[in-house]
């Protein structure tokens, strides 16, 4: 059975609500059946309604013809005085007890799913029956801190499942505010069936492409770039010092920095302030130094690519030649589609004369052949270069001796180049 309902008809206000028990007893016969006096309960009976909408439709159809100012047309066959809720000590002849029983319907809250209504605890007796003014209705309870009630989600979900079993209809019901037969019950705090994962305020929102490892790699790359930039600045300053020292064999003098417009303090020519006359020359020297360092890096890159065979250059004087059909001239000398490729000449006979490109040092061989064709005296250096290449141990000892002899003079220049040399060596080995 559902909760019982008590319907009170009063000229000032008509209300419907759910008390724990709504059974009332009347014992007297009416004297005037055409007039319904205030304060008298009209006993009637209804089949147990399924929901609030069915109860509203039954009551509205029954009492829509009533003139509430004169109470004419009210379907009453008895005029009964108000008596106590307590049943009489013994039954009477014309005793009647009527109850309204409905099942609770869903509560519709904007933005939230339909949640089964929980049972409302019985209300305490008010001062309606004592002749006082009606007590103003209590507004519905609101859950102002829903995040505090989500700790024990199992209990709320179990209550939600139990409520779904008792629900007899799935229609959405909307509370009609102002309707005297509409009851607003306190809302029971529950949790929705769709739970979003909790999120902490202030957590960084990472992009799917930006993983922690890639972020660390980016930071490490920025540190390497900053380190290399500081080393390049140091290299430029040391080379500028060396360049300036070439003009002053006895030592670099101090720059007075005196001119007609500005008066500056004494300083070195390698650190002139913007107000000094030597400032523009200092930056011109450093610009040339930066260009030379960039050229050195490009030369190293070309040497590395040429050593790997990634610069296909046809030699001037091929050592081996092959004659193939011109339609096969684009194929490599070893009948492969990978380097080294072959260079072909197309005669009129329809055949091509091809010779292969070296798999390594193709650009070096081309430049050496070009230099020998213009400068014949370079042929005298060929035995020396072959000897240095064949006797590598002697060449290393010679290099060590040169560094030992000129080391103190180059000590202020070589240290900034050491990180660059190490970087070039690693690239040479692992690429």
From Swiss-Prot:
Chain intervals for the UniProt region annotation (Pre-S2): 149-207
PTM note: Isoform M is N-terminally acetylated by host at a ratio of 90%, and N-glycosylated by host at the pre-S2 region.
First-listed, main subcellular location of the protein, grouped into a coarse class: virion
Top-level taxonomy: Viruses, Riboviria, Pararnavirae, Artverviricota, Revtraviricetes
Region (Disordered): 115-147
Intravirion side: 2-286, 236-286, 401-406
Region annotated Pre-S1, chain positions: 2-148
Domain notes: The large envelope protein is synthesized with the pre-S region at the cytosolic side of the endoplasmic reticulum and, hence will be within the virion after budding. Therefore the pre-S region is not N-glycosylated. Later a post-translational translocation of N-terminal pre-S and TM1 domains occur in about 50% of proteins at the virion surface. These molecules change their topology by an unknown mechanism, resulting in exposure of pre-S region at virion surface.
Native source species: Woodchuck hepatitis B virus (isolate 7) (WHV)
Residues annotated as glycosylated: 351
Segments on the Virion surface side according to the record's topology features: 2-214, 308-379, 430-431
Region (Pre-S): 2-207
Subcellular location: Virion membrane
Record-stated family: Belongs to the orthohepadnavirus major surface antigen family.
One Pfam family hit: vMSA
Keyword Membrane appears in the UniProt entry: yes
Keywords: Acetylation, Caveolin-mediated endocytosis of virus by host, Fusion of virus membrane with host endosomal membrane, Fusion of virus membrane with host membrane, Glycoprotein, Host-virus interaction, Lipoprotein, Membrane, Myristate, Transmembrane, Transmembrane helix, Viral attachment to host cell, Viral envelope protein, Viral penetration into host cytoplasm, Virion, Virus endocytosis by host, Virus entry into host cell
InterPro entries per the UniProt record, alphabetical: HBV_HBSAG
Function, in words: The large envelope protein exists in two topological conformations, one which is termed 'external' or Le-HBsAg and the other 'internal' or Li-HBsAg. In its external conformation the protein attaches the virus to cell receptors and thereby initiating infection. This interaction determines the species specificity and liver tropism. This attachment induces virion internalization predominantly through caveolin-mediated endocytosis. The large envelope protein also assures fusion between virion membrane and endosomal membrane. The middle envelope protein plays an important role in the budding of the virion. It is involved in the induction of budding in a nucleocapsid independent way. In this process the majority of envelope proteins bud to form subviral lipoprotein particles of 22 nm of diameter that do not contain a nucleocapsid.
GO cellular component, one term: membrane
Lipid-bearing positions (N-myristoyl glycine): 2
The protein's name: Large envelope protein
TM spans (from-to): 215-235, 287-307, 380-400, 407-429
GO terms (BP aspect): caveolin-mediated endocytosis of virus by host cell; fusion of virus membrane with host endosome membrane; virion attachment to host cell
